[in-house]
Structure formats: structure tokens, C-alpha cells
Curated annotation (Swiss-Prot):
The keyword Nucleotide-binding applies. Residues 254-269 have a biased composition (Basic residues). It holds the Pfam family GTP_EFTU_D2. GTP binds at residues 400-407, 446-450, 500-503. The gene is infB. Residues 391-560 form the tr-type G domain. Residues 446-449 are annotated as: G3. One of its GO terms (cellular component) is cytosol. This is Translation initiation factor IF-2. CDD domains: IF2_eIF5B (cd01887), IF2_mtIF2_II (cd03702), mtIF2_IVc (cd03692). It is found in: Cytoplasm. It comes from the Bacteria.
């Protein structure tokens, strides 16, 4: 038999190549798909397969089903049958031969050990029995010797005992008499105590019966069956169960017309409740008729004479209704007390802790202030961060005006192309990168320079150690440059100035120094504290000097952080990835963040399922000053939130939920504060046009920046209203919300999914995609400008002087005029001026030249003008003709 390849053998046997390779491996032969198979190896495989076929099944499963019928009594005496099937399943697993041998050997060894222990126990019992017999024999001999000695002594003392017998008998009789007297006294005392207890019990029972009779109706009560003889030790529920059984036994004999009488009594109510209700109704009826006044309710409970002072526990916020419940008073009383203190409130209004404390103490209650963030503080304090601090890399934020070359500068340092890949060549996210240099590691944060990203720049300044202020040498100090200086000063971080674009012919670095000195940034050569470095991101000049300046500044700051222990840091950016879920870019400040750690991040929590660096590579841990992307949070955190590693996921969840609830309460409390200055704004609210927008963006920072920019566009006439905003693609929910609120759907670097597109098409919604924030803001401005009411402007088109006035039977006074300027048109409004003062404003009724009606009369011609509803025209008056022009306004 010739050798064949394994692939051919698989085709011949009609099995897959992988299956055949696995069978060879089970037989102890390693083969790949292209290896040849000899006849000997085929025989070995065949023998292995035969052995497997001969061996019986390893597992046996027995299933058993039993069916039964259960009758369930239903309403109206009918019963319902329910089929019940019980399934039982048992699986017997055949043991491996080697395992069976091992277990048999273990059982044999155990049996031998038990037999050996039994033999040893028998021998021990024999020894103990022998020793016991010996001890008993010795004791018997001792007892016999003692009895013999006693008999001899008794014989000797017999004579003397006879003499003392009489005296002993007398003493014993006296002792018995005293014992009998003591027993008689004790019996009498017990009878007296029992009698007193019985009298006390009778007195208590009589008093209870009397109070019960006083609290009942004055009408004759129904006789109550006395069950005290057999219900002494049973509870109320046991008595009800016994009575129920008795009724069922008695009622079972004659089911029929009287079957309803055997119904069980209602739980939780007295047996007489129905009779009481009937009597109450009868009493009301008699009271109305005025015939029977005998049935009246007597209340035995007396109202407490003095107020009850309670301990009231108050959290950080509480509603007026909850405060009233805790003090056990009506809500109206609390509202009255607040009005006395000068605060107007409703029962559902949320009030703060101080106000609630004042009100409760005013009403005479003791206040206990509850610190609701105790759990949060406990979770934060339970962290092992006691290790010694070590030097860490500086966190450097690149700031400056838009298009001044921040990303290009960082791009050259990292030797990558980031700027060309960003929309419009401008940065719209915070980018976090760490760079290894010859002198150490530096972490860079690249912030946007556009005016819309103020909050993002402020966040970058707070998380940083050093700010590198990039200023273009040909452009000088610009608005965002000034804002970046203010952020750096507010954060209290040193500034290193990088004068960029130094290779341009129109570059003027001295002008940059002069302009920056006006804002407190003085170069070192002028006696200041800021280092100025001339760089060119395009040519690469001055980059090494800039890095040296950064490291020198970091050395002066002596930056240190704890490297070991549980990590803490800040969220630089966050977004929702469709495949990976919420993703947060975290800058670690201290400790080491490991994969699998439980993190608490603002309102969100979770376990770190994966960590990636800025290059997209998986990492297992991140130390201080290292930026990483983490996956596994419960939701998208807000940019700028603190990230803390905690021990217990359950406690982290509780803290996150507490923060969400607290944020909601504070938000509601803030909304309900009615301010006087908003009153007039609310009155004119209906006259203001609104541009409703549903905004979705790729990252949290962009949502925040765009929302702030759009809200700043609002004017007194047109307001921008962000109906909904979020991170991630446009969903069907967003489209439905936009349709309900008549809003524009705006997607910034995101797209709508299939279900959302269907809703958008069916509802004909306005959907707009943007990748550059300039275009978004410009188009929203244009939409708002279209809603502005146009500006009306009056333009004078003609002026006529009245030379003579004559009467017309049809129009009254007619002014004979000479057109001195422009053109007089028939259907335009006019003003009559006398001594340059407007005395009438109206319209022309007739315009004639000679006897013909004309539409217009030009400059230098005479005409007759009839003014509608005005006859007091005099010689020398001026008639001014004007037209109203609508000018479309725009938002600056």
C-alpha cells in the first residue's frame, strides 16, 4: 500500500482535514494537512478507532415522566382540573478504567483501615473490661473488710447505744414537730400569694371589660360566645383557624341553601364589624328622621394635652410634604410656619437643609442633620495610597489661537500626521499623548483653539502642570491667546511661550513679546518668569530647545506622585463607541491603573475591561501622567469628572446612584426658585421665536462646546433651545424627539442609523451633518436670522411745495404744488410739514396734472394733490412723500 497525503486520506474517508488531524493526535501521531501517511500509521489509527468504537457509551441518561391531575376549587363552588407533569432525569456517568481502579484501591484501603480500627477498638474494650473487673474485685474486698469491722464495732457499742436510745428518740420527735410547723406556714403563705394573684387578675379583667363596654355603642350588644375556657393559651390566628374548621365540619353535612353561612370571617376586622356598620347606618337614618336618638358613638380616647416633640432626621434636601410627615403634622401647618419665617412654599417644593432645620426647630422638634455623603467619603478614604511619592513626568497643555500651529508643533514632536486627518485642519477634541525624549517622558494635551471650545481649554489647564502658549510670529496675540493666558493664570500654572512660524518672512517675534507683556507674560531677558522659544513646526527648528525648556520648568516644579497603590485621575474626553460602548480618555494623576480595577467616575462606575494607549495598543497598566482609553463604564462620563479606583463594586454603584439622585434634587431645587427678574421675561416668553435643536456628537467635549456656542447665539427675539443632546449616533429616539418638538437634527461627526432614517424620511425632518464647528454655527445663525422680524426703514422719494390752495366739490381742499425734489407717487404715504414740523401723516387721495389723473409727477413739474381726510392745507406747507423699505436683519 503506497503512502498518501493526509488531505487525500481525509477526502477518501469523507471527513474534514481538521477532524482527521485530531484523530491522529488522539492516536498519538502528530500530523499536518500536507504530511504523508504510511500504512503502519493507518493501521495504528484504525486500531485506535476500533478501540473507541468497542468501548461503550460513557454516559447514560434516564428520563421519567409522571402525570397527575390536581383539582383546584374555584369561585361559585366549581372546581378546576390542572394537568401536572413531573419530569425526572438521572444521568449515570461511566468512570474511566484507571479512575475506577484508583477508586477501588482507595475503597479497599479505607475498608482495611476501618477493619484495623475495629480490631484495635475491640482490644481496647477487652483491656478496659479486665481493668474494670480487677477494680471491682478490689472494691468488693474492701467493702467486706469494712462491714466486718463495722459489725465488730456495733457489737461493742450495742450496750452503750441502749443507754442513749431514749435521749435520741426524744430529740428526733422534737425535730419532726418543728419541720411539720414550718411546712404548714409555707403552705399558708403560698395559698395567700395565689389568692392575691387571682384577685389582681379578676380586677384587671373587670376593668378591661368595663372599658370595653364604655367604648361600645349604647344599644344592647349582641351576645358574644365565651371562649376563654379553651382559648387560654392560643393566639388570635389559631382561634380563627379552629373556628373555621368547626364551621366547615358543621356546614359540610348540609351543603345547600345554608352553605353560604360557612364562609370564613374577614381577616383583620372584628367579627361584629358588619353588625356595627348596620347599626351605624340605622343610627344615621334615625338621626335624620328625628325619631330615635339612642344610638350614638362614644369616643373613649382623650386627645393628648401637650404636643409631642420628635427627633426629625433631615437630609441635604427635603420636600415640605416629607418634612410634615416626619414631624407628624399637616403640610398646611409647615407652610404657615414658613410664611411666618418669610418664605413662601408649596407642599411639593424642595427646600434645603438649613431652611428645614429652622422650620422644625421653630415648631419645637429636635433636628438631627444627616450627612448623606458618608458612604461616598468612606469609599474614598478606603484606598491604599500610603506609599512614598516618586518623580513623575510633566503634563503639558498646548494652548493658543486657532490656526497658530499647535497640533502641527505637537505633530512634529510625535513624528506623526494628526493635523491633516482632522476636519478643516482644526482640532476639535482634546488629544492626549505621551512622548519619550532623551531627557525623560512628557505628556502632551492638545486643546482646541477655536472660540467655541472655552470649557475644553479650561479643563486642559486644570489637569496640567505646564502650559505651552503657541503664538504665530506673523499673527501676534489673538482673542483665544488672551483667553488661554487667563486660563493658565486661573489654574496657577507656569507658561512657556513657543513663538511659531518663525521661518516666515513676515515673522516679528519682538512684536509678540511686546503684546504678551501687556497681559503679564514677560520674557526672562526682560526680567520676567516666562521662557520664550522660537520654533517652526514646519521646518522643525527650535523643537529641541522647546523640550529642554519644558523639562527645565518641570525640574523646577519638582513634580512627584505616588506610583504604587490605587489610581486616581481625571476624564479628559469621553464618547460612545457603537461596538465598544462608553469610552473615556483618562489621565492618571497618581497610583497605577490596572486592567480589571473597579473605577468610580462621576455618575458612572464599572470595571476596566480594556485599556488602550493613544496609539490604540492594548496595555495592562498605566502609571502617573499616562493617558489611556478605558472601556467598561456603565455610561458616558462627563469630561472633567474625577476617576477613582475603589475596592467594592457594590459600594461604587451605590455612590454613583446617590450622586445621580443628588444632582437631580439640586436641579429641581434650582428650577423652583422663582426670581423677580425672571417674571417679566416669562411674561414676554410667547413673543420670542425658538430654534429647537437635537444635538448628537462623537465625544462629550464636542457636545459641551457646541451647546455653549449655540446658547450664546440667543437674542431677545430668537432663542436657541437644545431639546436633547448626547454622545453617539442619531437613533430613532432622537428622530422621534425632533419630530415631536419640531427641532433640527444636528449630527457632528456622527450619522443616523437605519431606523432613524426611516423616521426622518416619514416625518420630513431637517437633518444636517457637520464635521467643522464653524459651518454648524454659521448655519444655525442663518436659520435664526430667518426668524427675525425685518427692520422697516422709511426712505423719502419726493418733496412738493404748496403754492396755492383751491376747493374741489369732490375732494375738498386741493393743494396746488410744485415738485422740488424727487418724484411724487400716487399710492405712497405722505407727511404734511409746516415750518419743518410734521402736522399730519396720511396718504394721497388724488394726484392730478392739469385735469388728468396721473400715477407720478417728476421733479420740476406742477400738480394738484388731494390729501385724504385732511383739509387744513396752507400755502407754504411742504408735502413729503416716502416709501417703507423692509431690511432683513442678521445675527452678528
Amino acid at each position: 500500500m503506497t503512502d498518501v497525503t493526509l488531505k487525500a486520506l481525509a477526502a477518501e474517508r469523507q471527513v474534514s482535514v481538521d477532524r482527521l488531524v485530531q484523530q491522529f493526535a488522539d492516536a498519538g501521531i502528530r500530523k499536518s494537512a500536507d504530511d504523508s501517511v504510511s500504512a503502519q500509521e493507518k493501521q495504528t489509527l484504525l486500531a485506535h478507532l476500533n478501540r473507541e468504537a468497542v468501548s461503550g457509551p460513557d454516559k447514560l441518561t434516564l428520563q421519567r415522566k409522571t402525570r397527575s391531575t390536581l383539582n383546584i376549587p374555584g369561585t361559585g363552588g366549581k372546581s378546576k382540573s390542572v394537568q401536572i407533569e413531573v419530569r425526572k432525569k438521572r444521568t449515570f456517568v461511566k468512570r474511566d478504567p484507571q479512575e475506577a481502579e484508583r477508586l477501588a484501591a482507595e475503597e479497599q484501603a479505607q475498608r482495611e483501615a476501618e477493619e484495623q480500627a475495629r480490631r484495635e477498638a475491640e482490644e481496647q474494650a477487652k483491656r478496659e473490661a479486665q481493668q474494670k473487673a480487677e477494680r471491682e474485685a478490689a472494691e468488693q474486698a474492701k467493702r467486706e473488710a469494712a462491714e466486718k469491722a463495722k459489725r465488730e464495732a456495733a457489737e461493742k457499742d450495742k450496750v452503750s447505744n441502749q443507754q442513749t436510745d431514749d435521749m435520741t428518740k426524744t430529740a428526733q420527735a422534737e425535730k419532726a414537730r418543728r419541720e411539720n410547723e414550718a411546712a404548714e406556714l409555707k403552705r399558708k403563705a403560698e395559698e395567700e400569694a395565689r389568692r392575691k394573684l387571682e384577685e389582681e387578675a379578676r380586677r384587671v379583667a373587670e376593668e378591661a371589660r368595663r372599658m370595653a363596654e364604655e367604648n361600645k355603642w349604647t344599644a344592647t350588644p349582641e351576645p358574644v360566645e365565651d371562649t376563654s375556657d379553651y382559648h387560654v393559651t392560643t393566639s388570635q390566628h389559631a382561634r380563627q383557624a379552629e373556628d373555621e374548621n368547626d364551621r366547615e365540619v358543621e356546614g359540610g353535612r348540609g351543603r345547600g341553601r345554608n352553605a353560604k353561612a360557612a364562609r370564613p370571617a374577614k381577616k383583620g376586622k372584628h367579627a361584629e364589624s358588619k353588625a356595627d356598620r348596620e347599626e351605624a347606618r340605622a343610627a344615621v337614618r334615625c338621626g335624620k328622621g328625628g325619631k330615635r336618638k339612642g344610638s350614638s358613638l362614644q369616643q373613649g380616647f382623650q386627645k393628648p394635652a401637650q404636643a409631642v416633640n420628635r427627633d426629625v432626621v433631615i437630609g441635604e434636601t427635603i420636600t415640605v410634604g416629607e418634612l410634615a410627615n416626619k414631624m407628624a403634622v399637616k403640610g398646611s401647618q409647615v407652610i404657615k410656619a414658613m410664611m411666618k419665617l418669610g418664605a413662601m412654599a408649596t407642599i411639593n417644593q424642595v427646600i434645603d437643609q438649613e431652611t428645614a432645620q429652622l422650620v422644625a426647630e421653630e415648631m419645637g422638634h429636635k433636628v438631627i442633620l444627616r450627612r448623606e455623603n458618608e458612604l461616598e467619603e468612606a469609599v474614598m478614604s478606603d484606598r491604599d495610597t500610603g506609599a512614598a511619592a516618586e518623580p513623575r513626568a510633566p503634563v503639558v497643555t498646548i494652548m493658543g489661537h486657532v490656526d497658530h500651529g499647535k497640533t502641527s508643533l505637537l505633530d512634529y514632536i510625535r513624528s506623526t500626521k494628526v493635523a491633516s486627518g482632522e476636519a478643516g485642519g482644526i482640532t476639535q477634541h482634546i488629544g492626549a499623548y505621551h512622548v519619550e525624549t532623551d531627557n525623560g517622558m512628557i505628556t502632551f494635551l492638545d486643546t482646541p483653539g477655536h472660540a467655541a471650545f472655552t470649557s475644553m481649554r479650561a479643563r486642559g489647564a486644570q489637569a496640567t502642570d505646564i502650559v505651552v502658549l503657541v503664538v504665530a510670529a506673523d499673527d501676534g496675540v489673538m482673542p483665544q491667546t488672551i483667553e488661554a493666558i487667563q486660563h493658565a493664570k486661573a489654574a496657577g500654572v507656569p507658561v512657556v511661550v513657543a513663538v511659531n512660524k518663525i521661518d516666515k518672512p513676515e515673522a516679528d517675534p519682538d512684536r509678540v513679546k511686546n503684546e504678551l507683556s501687556q497681559y503679564g507674560i514677560l520674557p526672562e531677558e526682560w526680567g520676567g518668569e516666562s521662557q520664550f522659544v522660537h520654533v517652526s513646526a514646519k521646518a522643525g527648528t527650535g523643537i529641541d530647545e522647546l523640550l529642554d525648556a519644558i523639562l527645565l520648568q518641570a525640574e523646577v516644579l519638582e513634580l512627584k506622585a505616588v506610583r504604587k497603590g490605587m489610581a486616581s485621575g481625571a476624564v479628559i474626553e469621553s464618547f460612545l463607541d457603537k461596538g465598544r460602548g462608553p469610552v473615556a480618555t483618562v489621565l492618571v494623576r497618581e497610583g497605577t491603573l490596572h486592567k480589571g480595577d473597579i473605577v468610580l467616575c462621576g455618575f458612572e462606575y464599572g470595571r476596566v475591561r480594556a485599556m488602550r494607549n493613544e496609539l490604540g495598543q492594548e496595555v495592562l497598566e498605566a502609571g502617573p501622567s499616562i493617558p489611556v482609553e478605558i472601556l467598561g463604564l456603565s455610561g458616558v462620563p462627563a469630561a472633567g469628572d474625577e476617576v477613582t479606583v475603589v475596592r467594592d463594586e457594590k459600594k461604587a454603584r451605590e455612590v454613583a446612584l446617590y450622586r445621580q439622585g443628588k444632582f437631580r434634587e439640586v436641579k429641581l431645587a434650582r428650577q423652583q426658585k422663582s426670581k423677580l427678574e425672571n417674571m417679566f421675561a416669562n411674561m414676554t416668553e410667547g413673543e420670542v421665536h425658538e430654534v429647537n435643536i437635537v444635538l448628537k456628537a462623537d465625544v462629550q467635549g464636542s457636545v459641551e462646546a457646541i451647546s455653549d456656542s449655540l446658547l450664546k447665539l440667543s437674542t431677545d427675539e430668537v432663542k436657541v433651545k437644545i431639546i436633547g443632546s448626547g454622545v453617539g449616533g442619531i437613533t430613532e429616539t432622537d428622530a422621534t424627539l425632533a419630530a415631536a418638538s419640531n427641532a433640527i437634527l444636528v449630527g457632528f461627526n456622527v450619522r443616523a442609523d437605519a431606523s432613524a432614517r426611516k423616521v426622518i424620511e416619514s416625518e420630513s425632518l431637517d437633518l444636517r451633518y457637520y464635521s467643522v464647528i464653524y459651518n454648524l454655527i454659521d448655519e444655525v445663525k442663518a436659520a435664526m436670522s430667518g426668524m427675525l422680524s425685518p427692520e422697516l426703514k422709511q426712505q423719502i422719494i419726493g418733496l412738493a411745495e404748496v403754492r396755492d390752495v383751491f376747493k374741489s366739490p369732490k375732494f375738498g381742499a386741493i393743494a396746488g404744488c410744485m415738485v422740488t425734489e424727487g418724484t411724487i407717487k400716487r399710492h405712497n404715504p405722505i407727511r404734511v410739514l409746516r415750518d419743518n414740523v410734521v402736522i399730519y401723516e396720511g396718504e394721497l387721495e388724488s394726484l392730478r396734472r392739469f385735469k388728468d389723473d396721473v400715477n407720478e409727477v417728476r421733479n420740476g413739474m406742477e400738480c394738484g394733490i388731494g390729501v385724504k381726510n385732511y383739509n387744513d392745507v396752507r400755502v407754504g406747507d411742504m408735502i413729503e412723500v416716502f416709501e417703507i423699505i423692509e431690511i432683513q436683519r442678521t445675527i452678528a
